[in-house]
UniProtKB/Swiss-Prot annotation:
Chief place of localization: cytoplasm
Organism: Rhodococcus erythropolis (strain PR4 / NBRC 100887)
Name of the gene this protein is made from: rimM
Cellular compartments annotated: Cytoplasm
UniProt record similarity statement: Belongs to the RimM family.
Record's GO cellular component terms: cytoplasm; ribosome
InterPro entries linked: PRC-brl_dom, PRC_barrel-like_sf, RimM, RimM_N, RimM_N_sf, Transl_B-barrel_sf
Single biological process term from Gene Ontology: rRNA processing
Domain of life where this protein originates: Bacteria
Descriptive protein name: Ribosome maturation factor RimM
Entry-linked NCBIfam families: 16S_RimM
Subunit structure: Binds ribosomal protein uS19.
Length: 190
């Protein structure tokens, strides 16, 4: 299975540097000088190899210089390129409570009483922590966002293909937080 470890967001400067959105826990290894990256444009299947010539942090962003990319035009042509690895290249985790995103995607989500909620379609990473994006059973669109925290996610079994949750009241309510349904209208005060 192909996993994205970075995406070229844009060019930086006039010497061909690239701003890369990092999607790996090990950027210092994946993007080290001399590393060979495999990249492709979104929705394309042809992979091209790129050798890292230089890598540096700049204001919290990763800047890369790749061999053969020497000016802004070359760099702009790579905008949107996804750097990928094969999941078989990943080391298995020794921590039973640590998972790769691709291991969680597709798992069935059930309540502690056994009620099926849906399945994990994506793991989102935010400054506040990880969220599981859940597609409800029987629905073809829309999503529920569930914080991936021990207080809500009580267990994960990759072997059984199940994420067990015990959400607080209202978290699974589709109208949760929708102010248009509140009873705070002043129509009686005419």
């Amino acid at each position: 299975m192909e996993l994205v470890v970075g995406r070229v967001a844009k060019s930086h400067g006039i010497k061909g540097e690239l701003v890369v959105e990092v999607r790996t826990d090990e950027p210092e290894d994946r993007f080290a000088v001399g590393s060979v990256l495999r990249g492709r444009k979104p929705r394309e299947s042809t992979l091209k190899s790129y050798t890292v010539e230089a890598a540096r942090d700049h204001s919290g962003r990763l800047l890369l210089r790749l061999e053969g990319v020497s000016d802004r035009g070359d760099a702009d042509a790579l905008r949107g390129t996804l750097f990928v690895i094969d999941s078989s290249e990943l080391e298995p985790s020794d921590d039973p409570d640590e998972f790769y995103d691709h291991e969680l995607e597709g798992l069935k989500v059930v309540l502690t009483d056994g009620t099926e909620v849906g399945s994990v379609i994506e793991v989102l990473h935010s400054a506040a922590g990880e969220l599981l994006s859940i597609r409800r059973t029987g629905e073809t669109s829309g999503e529920l966002l569930i914080p991936f925290v021990a207080a809500i996610v009580t267990s994960v079994s990759i072997a059984d293909g199940v994420v067990m949750i015990e959400p607080p009241e209202g978290l699974l309510d589709p109208d949760f937080g929708d102010k248009s349904n509140s009873d705070n209208s002043n129509s009686d005060n005419d």
